[in-house]
Curated annotation (Swiss-Prot):
MF annotations from Gene Ontology: chalcone isomerase activity
Keyword Membrane: no
GO BP field: flavonoid biosynthetic process
InterPro entries given in the database record: CFI, Chalcone_isomerase, Chalcone_isomerase_3-sand, Chalcone_isomerase_bundle_sf, Chalcone_isomerase_sf
Record-given protein name: Chalcone--flavanone isomerase
Top class in the EC scheme: isomerase
Keywords from the UniProt entry: Flavonoid biosynthesis, Isomerase
Membership in a protein family: Belongs to the chalcone isomerase family.
Residue sites binding substrate per the record: T57, N122, S199
The enzyme's E.C. designation: 5.5.1.6
Pfam families: Chalcone
Transmembrane segment boundaries: none
Organism the protein comes from: Arabidopsis lyrata subsp. petraea
Amino acid sequence: MSFSPVSPSQFPSVTKLQVDSVTFDPSVKSPASSNPLFLGGAGVRGLDIQGKFVIFTVIGVYLESNAVPSLSVKWKGKTTEELSESVPFFREIVTGAFEKFIKVTMKLPLTGQQYSEKVTENCVAIWKSLGIYTDCEAKAVEKFLEIFKEETFPPGSSILFALSPTGSLTVAFSRDDSIPETGIAVIENKLLAEAVLESIIGKNGVSPGTRLSIAERLAKLMTKNKVEEDASNHSIDEKLAKEN
């Protein structure tokens, strides 16, 4: 099923989010396409270490505007709780035919090797659980690791991923809060692109907070979209009634 592009007047109206002193703007331009994307949700990634929750990164997930009508077909009217607990809902976000963008901002310093090895480990686990790990994915993992090998990420720097509907994964880096106009590398592997996002917001994703934030914001946006659809259909029905 395809959806026509959303006009600027239909671009989702959302607020910025501040998560652990990191601010995510309500919209950004993708370094892969220059398309405007809206903030779907944001949260932290951390671990309990000796009884203390330590935050490593703060993550924001942006979506193309046609994600709202696309997801509304099946999910409008669902509550935040229903969406947050739904594996199929987040699979549909991961695999949907709309652009996604992920901004991962460091709270603690990480080397590129540390970050990329953990991400690819999670991706491989997802593929093996789905029975879809092939030589193509193994080569994509090698390229991913190579991109990050010499990098270091101090606090405040960001790793950026743009996922195109056709399946390419554009990688970019930022040393501050800015988003570069272009990426530094592109990996043409749809399963890797999807797995990077799924490793964050999927069933066993590393950021339950981001998952909940997306569920909450999309539940509201889909309800708003439904109200606008109903109003539009009502006005069409009225017009047809007058003509008849």
